[in-house]
Amino acid sequence: MRWSRGRGGGLLTWLKRLIVRSVLVVIGAWLAGILLFSFLPVPFSAVMVDRQVSAWLKGEFAYVAHSDWVAMDDIAPAMALAVMAAEDQKFPQHWGFDVDAIGQALKHNERNTQRVRGASTLSQQMVKNLFLWDGRSWVRKGLEAGITTGVELVWTKRRIITVYLNIAEFGPGVFGVEAAARRYFNKSASKLTASESALLAAVLPNPIRFRANAPSGYVIQRQQWILRQMRQMGGDAFLRDNNLN
């Protein structure tokens, strides 16, 4: 009996150490990613890996998660403005979290349990795409908040929007604005017009359901709304005033 308890205790201790070490390794990888990707091109994201593995498991071997990294100088200014107009107009001002939007989302979700509203900023979306996974859970949101804080402390806003645009999903297997521009408009990201940029931004809430190459009435309406918001924000002057161009 003593031997059994001793062996069980030893196994429990080993498991605890394994868990602690695994957690430390993951945290270390995230910290390294925050530091390295503050200046290095991002080769792939967690969401890209998830999509690719899921496709393989389903036997969809023709699926390829594709992305082409481009610098901010090689992306049309309208594209950066479009995603901010669509997803996070307070992006230059906040430190990763839009408190007002969070409050509004909580009130909305209390009244409407069937249609949940999110309040994630571009910083949070970028962190989720780069380091984490899809889905709604308090664990993921907690990790997202912690990593977002680290990113906002280390990265510039220009870097955050650059990485966001390079890893955002714009359709099945289409990741990053360069791949999207090539796929849907047969041009480089630097040549995108305001209308094309707004169309790409319009599918971001759900790029699997919404298609830039076959936009629904809702997507077209959203595109037009984004274009109006871009004008109201001040166009290219908004980017210059916030050191984002």
UniProtKB/Swiss-Prot annotation:
Origin species: Pectobacterium atrosepticum (strain SCRI 1043 / ATCC BAA-672) (Erwinia carotovora subsp. atroseptica)
Look up and give the membrane topology term: Single-pass membrane protein
Provide the protein name: Biosynthetic peptidoglycan transglycosylase
Q: What does this protein do?
A: Peptidoglycan polymerase that catalyzes glycan chain elongation from lipid-linked precursors.
Q: Where in the cell is it found?
A: Cell inner membrane
User: Catalytic activity, per the record?
Assistant: [GlcNAc-(1->4)-Mur2Ac(oyl-L-Ala-gamma-D-Glu-L-Lys-D-Ala-D-Ala)](n)-di-trans,octa-cis-undecaprenyl diphosphate + beta-D-GlcNAc-(1->4)-Mur2Ac(oyl-L-Ala-gamma-D-Glu-L-Lys-D-Ala-D-Ala)-di-trans,octa-cis-undecaprenyl diphosphate = [GlcNAc-(1->4)-Mur2Ac(oyl-L-Ala-gamma-D-Glu-L-Lys-D-Ala-D-Ala)](n+1)-di-trans,octa-cis-undecaprenyl diphosphate + di-trans,octa-cis-undecaprenyl diphosphate + H(+)
Q: Name a biological process GO annotation.
A: regulation of cell shape
A GO molecular-function term, please?
Answer: peptidoglycan glycosyltransferase activity
Gene from which this protein is expressed: mtgA
